[in-house]
A protein has these predicted regions:
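Hydrophobic or amphipathic, alpha-helical segments that drive membrane association/targeting
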Residues: 1-151
Length: 151
């Protein structure tokens, strides 16, 4: 399999995964919006309409954030792979590594490879921080699940 064929297969699988996740999220959102106005019969005696609508609004907010997160993570994966981000990170880390440990060259060892993985994981975690902050301090706080503040 050539590099081009592998890239096409990767993009096809990524597009399939993105489409399915988006479809499921939108289906879930559509179902929640459609049934927001009435409590299901099985719960009619235990949950008030107001509580049911509040739960539906919370679910809508969480789905909206999840869709945004899915879009950003998909773009991040495309940037790392097809966009050459991983090669750029590897090159930059190689320069830093060669400066810090000149005696360890001519070939990257296991410690360099592990550090490359850790850098990519750290950058991905930094990408997750705004979503986590928004989830806890905006969405959860708006619905009364989080009473913490930044102060």
């Amino acid at each position: 399999m050539s590099t081009f064929q592998f890239t096409l297969a990767f993009l096809a699988l990524l597009a399939t995964q993105f489409s399915l996740r988006m479809l499921l999220a939108l289906r879930h959102l559509w179902h929640v919006v459609r049934h927001r106005g009435a409590v299901p019969d099985a719960f009619r005696h235990t949950i008030s309409l107001e509580s049911h609508q509040r739960a539906a609004d919370y679910t809508r907010a969480k789905i909206g954030l999840a869709v945004s997160e899915l879009l950003v993570h998909t773009l991040w994966l495309l940037l790392l792979t097809v966009g050459g981000g991983l090669a750029w990170i590897q090159s930059a880390l190689g320069t830093v590594w060669a400066t810090a440990f000149p005696q360890e060259m001519p070939g990257p060892g296991l410690d360099y490879q592990v550090s490359l993985i850790l850098v990519v994981v750290a950058l991905g975690s930094l990408l997750d921080l705004p979503f986590s902050w928004w989830r806890h301090f905006r969405v959860d706080a708006r619905f009364g699940f989080n009473r913490m503040s930044l102060r």
